[in-house]
Amino acid sequence: MSSPVNSDSSPVNPSQRALILVVERNPAVQRLERFFLEQAGYSVEFASDGVSALERARELCPKIVVTEILVPRLDGLSLCRALKSDPRTRSIVVLVFSHLHAEDRALEAGADAFIVKPIDEENLIDIVSKLLEIRKEGAGG
């Protein structure tokens, strides 16, 4: 079983945790997402809108950006296009989610994956883990 969840016998050093930038404006949802993703062994940072997410992505170089399509100031699809067109951020994996069935539009914008909401904790962690594994394999291991 290749779960990203840590066992007591193999703790993850915080400096070795993959950094995930989540675009989420609701503080209650941020707390839940932080809890679930940190329990799974990831470091988590948040941006409350697309413009600040783009700035934070350039500053932090996270492994993954997780964004909804409908976010303020710069929608998730425009954020994805901006990330994928910038040499500093084009290698960042982008996971887009929405209530809208917009997978084609998300993939055309450069998203690496798309999820229809609602997203449950296990599904989110599983997809993040798989995307990181694919990215690692693509980078030569």
Segments and roles (model prediction):
Residues 94-97:
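Hydrophobic/aromatic residues positioned on beta-strands within the core alpha/beta folds
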Residues 27-45:
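Two-component/phosphorelay signaling modules centered on CheY-like receiver
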Residues 1-21, 25, 122-141:
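Non-catalytic signal-transmission and effector/linker regions of two-component phosphorelay proteins
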Residues 71-72, 117:
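The feature encodes the CheY-like receiver
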Residues 60-66, 71:
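Active-site beta3 strand of CheY-like receiver
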Residues 30, 34, 78, 99-116, ...:
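Alpha4 helix (beta4-alpha4-beta5 surface) of REC/receiver domains from two-component response regulators
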Residues 49-52, 75-78:
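Acidic catalytic/metal-coordinating carboxylates
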